[in-house]
């Protein structure tokens, strides 16, 4: 697991950090070395979320989210976006490529592993497909927004 991913895991909600380490390690083991998972986004501030929401609306760019600040699972530390790092150099979001030649798309191997741990893939959503996105199952931003925060700023479950 690379340093960037480790740093991003360390900022996720404390209740999912250990699980995320297991997920990433399982993905990397399944991918057999050529491709490795990198978390490109984890915990996101309300301000960062609002800036992303502005893209394609009030700011130039393509829409990348349907969620305003506070309305994303990222804002609570229960979501990650990933890419695959190929040969330690190149970032890829190709969901069909099979770099380890095991007849299963590497991205889909990761989707399966995340699902086994109770995480939902944004690529399975019907309206707004978010291919790099995974979030903890059975949590909604509306539920999370009502919870009190601990001294570190994370919601108390």
Which sequence ranges carry the predicted segments?
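Cell-envelope/glycan interface and biosynthesis
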Residues: 1-140, 150, 154-156
């Amino acid at each position: 697991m690379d340093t960037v991913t480790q740093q991003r895991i360390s900022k996720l909600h404390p209740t999912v950090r250990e699980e995320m380490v297991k997920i990433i390690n399982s993905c990397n083991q399944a991918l057999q070395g050529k491709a490795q998972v990198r978390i490109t986004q984890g915990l996101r501030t309300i301000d960062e979320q609002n800036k992303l929401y502005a893209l394609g609306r009030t700011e130039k760019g393509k829409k990348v989210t349907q969620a305003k600040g506070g309305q994303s699972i990222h804002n609570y530390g229960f979501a990650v976006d990933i890419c695959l790092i190929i040969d330690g150099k190149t970032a890829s979001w190709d969901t069909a490529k099979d770099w380890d030649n095991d007849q299963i798309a590497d991205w889909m191997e990761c989707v399966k592993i995340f699902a086994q741990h109770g995480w939902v893939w944004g690529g399975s959503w019907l309206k707004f497909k978010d291919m790099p996105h995974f979030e903890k199952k059975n949590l909604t931003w509306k539920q999370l927004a009502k919870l009190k925060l601990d001294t570190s700023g994370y919601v108390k479950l």
